[in-house]
Amino acid sequence: MEAIRALNELPKNIAAAIRGLFADPYSLWADLTMTLIGMILIIVVIVISALLLIVLERKIAGWGSQRPGPNRLGPRGWFQTIADALKLLGKEDLTPANADRIMFKIAPMFIFGIPILTLTIIPFGYAMTVIDLELGVFFYLGITSVSTLALLMAGWSSNNKYSLLGGMRAVAQMISYEIPLIFSLLGVVMLTQTFNLTKIVEAQAALPFIFLQPIAFIIFLICGQAEVNRAPFDLLEADQEIIAGPFTEYTGLRWGLFYLGEYANLVAMCALATTVFLGGWQGPGVLPGWAWFWLKVGLLIFISMWVRWTFPRIRIDHLMHLAWKVLLPLALLNILLTGLGIYIYQLVIGG
């Protein structure tokens, strides 16, 4: 138990040691330095996670299709992603002649930068938050909304009909599913009376909110799958219909940033679900808190990959019907039931 406690305290002690290098450990420069170090670590985690998740998803796709998947490069094919990345870096970076060059070039940066910002407010473990915001839930939802604009920028600036159609699909889909996703989080906010993600995790010390908010958890998983544009909700890049959607004209490193951004958004969405519904770093003392956090995130990522390779892509009208006529009423019903439960608790037990 002492070893587990030491591992839990390790990030906090390292941060304290770095702050101790400054004359005032809590000065502006110390805060900026710690924030910069945290963001660099998040970028490293995102890149490593994406490299691992890409080959893992190909393995899961093979398992779901009763085939071995990549099995040539490295032990059982686990070096395949490295070879693909090197090949991608060697490709020519082309820009269409009639494209809006500025928007065309900054759209991939937005897609890759958004999950970096969202992960800065996620508590990965005890005292392991880059920026502990009181309005963490608001910040997350506000920043992720920008990805809709980035996809529309990519589609419109390419000056390609297929790209524009994919961008318009992205706007329709992500705005539609963002509303029930927001409402699914309101139940947890009502229970905890806070938007601070660290306080939400601490409120789950006795019982994760998945047991108190099962409807909200299911709604969040479905909407999260749609928000990160993964099957069966990947209509914006339906290759049989519109080639690759807003990514059609992108090549080389810029296309790679979109690819990395997809997996980074997946990690960020699963990290938020773990924080809000699965107790974050809370868990039995056999592992340090940050290990429990990443195990839960890994489980949700596996579920997302399993769904992608199990269910077929749905039609656009079915997509909209599910969001507006099924998930949104369920989310509103969950808010009503949560409010009723809180009232009964305060009236009977709390009073």
UniProtKB/Swiss-Prot annotation:
EC number(s) from the headed UniProt entry: 7.1.1.-
EC class name: translocase
Catalytic activity as recorded in UniProt: a quinone + NADH + 5 H(+)(in) = a quinol + NAD(+) + 4 H(+)(out)
InterPro entries hit by this protein: NADH_UbQ_OxRdtase_su1/FPO
Keywords attached to this entry: Cell membrane, Membrane, NAD, Quinone, Translocase, Transmembrane, Transmembrane helix, Ubiquinone
Location in or out of the cell: Cell membrane
Lipid bilayer topology: Multi-pass membrane protein
GO (cellular component) term, any one: plasma membrane
Superkingdom as given in the UniProt entry: Bacteria
Transmembrane annotation, as ranges: 36-56, 106-126, 135-155, 171-191, 203-223, 257-277, 286-306, 330-350
Pfam families: NADHdh
Molecular function via GO: NADH dehydrogenase activity; oxidoreductase activity, acting on NAD(P)H, quinone or similar compound as acceptor; quinone binding
Predominant location: membrane
One example of a Gene Ontology biological process annotation: aerobic respiration
Subunit structure and binding partners: NDH-1 is composed of 14 different subunits. Subunits NuoA, H, J, K, L, M, N constitute the membrane sector of the complex.
Protein family: Belongs to the complex I subunit 1 family.
Functional note: NDH-1 shuttles electrons from NADH, via FMN and iron-sulfur (Fe-S) centers, to quinones in the respiratory chain. The immediate electron acceptor for the enzyme in this species is believed to be ubiquinone. Couples the redox reaction to proton translocation (for every two electrons transferred, four hydrogen ions are translocated across the cytoplasmic membrane), and thus conserves the redox energy in a proton gradient. This subunit may bind ubiquinone.
HAMAP family, per database record: NDH1_NuoH
Entry protein name: NADH-quinone oxidoreductase subunit H
Gene: nuoH
